[in-house]
Amino acid sequence: MTEPVIPRAARLLSVASPDKVKRAGTVRRTVDTSPHDGRKPEWLKIKARMGDNYRDLTGLVADQGLATVCQQARCPNIFECWEMREATFLIGGEDCTRRCGFCQIKTGKPASYDTDEPRRVAESVKQMGLRYAVVTMVARDDLDDGGAWLVAETIRQIRGAVPGCGVEVLPSDFGYGHDQVAGLTALDQVVDAEPDVFAFNVETPRRLYPKIRPAFDYDRSMEFLQAARDRMPAATAIKSNIIVGMGETDDEVVEVLRDLRAHGVQLVTIGQYLQPSDLHLHLDRYVTPEQFAEYKRVGEQELGFDHIESGPMVRSSYHAGKQAIDAGAWTPP
């Protein structure tokens, strides 16, 4: 039996609201998004719809002792994504060397480098019969290349094991925020592996970085995305994510979208922050489905993104295959 890949949890995402359109990139306020009263709104309560593919994958994962972020994070979209034969894997170990206020993944000293992990992930992708695989990773500032080899080798292993399977990677910045030369050298390893989609999540506006993402820098993050666009093959799509509900203003959300577009990003996901525990960042507000639709309208129609996936339950890998298709980055076999 294949040794199981052991991922932990996925990042939780989120969204906000805005004001009347007078210029490109301005968002209409469609509903009241005042601070929440502690109760979860009805639109965040979903019904499980289990199709044949979902049942098949559930049985296979249990029989083979496999593991995915989808299960570990109790992602609400698992039924839909597995029905489309899409899943997400976390590589690089269980401990992250950075701490973000919204994230479930624990911070600590990482375990030793596991060079066999890429092969095991690829074997899992093959056994699950996936059409599209998303590979994310913890930050590994303890490694000279920030874990870039691990990401690149996972891409290569999946390509070899499952020809035609779409591959999207969501790594850290490989230390670019502190050492640009080393970060770009590491990034080039992933460039050479040619993922279909390269994602790096900015998550929140500049003002909130010191509080929410103290180990990252907003402007360096935008530079890193631009560097990825400049270095990656033209066919590779560049992607990012915004979490709203963490204290940002509506104008700041639109500003992030503008900045992302100006730095070569083609795909963006926007979803609701759901506070994992009392120890995590305080939830500021819930945003309605109508307001999420307005973010999508502004992003696609006014700012020119290839695809904006925006909704209360959206996570960064939600409908990842469809986004890749819309950006012309991947064609299903």
Question: Which residues fall in each region the model found?
Answer:
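Hydrophobic residues within beta-strands of alpha/beta enzymes
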Residues: 133-135, 167, 198-200, 268, ...
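Structural motif
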Residues: 124, 138, 168-172
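Local cysteine-cluster metal-coordination motifs and their immediate loop/turn environment
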Residues: 67-81, 92-107
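Active-site mouth loops of central-metabolism enzymes
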Residues: 91, 102-115, 168, 172-182, ...
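Conserved alpha-helical substructure of the radical SAM core
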Residues: 107-134
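Short acidic active-site motifs
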Residues: 185-186, 208
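Auxiliary Fe-S-binding modules of radical SAM enzymes
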Residues: 1-87, 119, 123-126, 153-164, ...
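Conserved radical SAM core fold
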Residues: 134-144, 174-177, 196-218, 237-239, ...
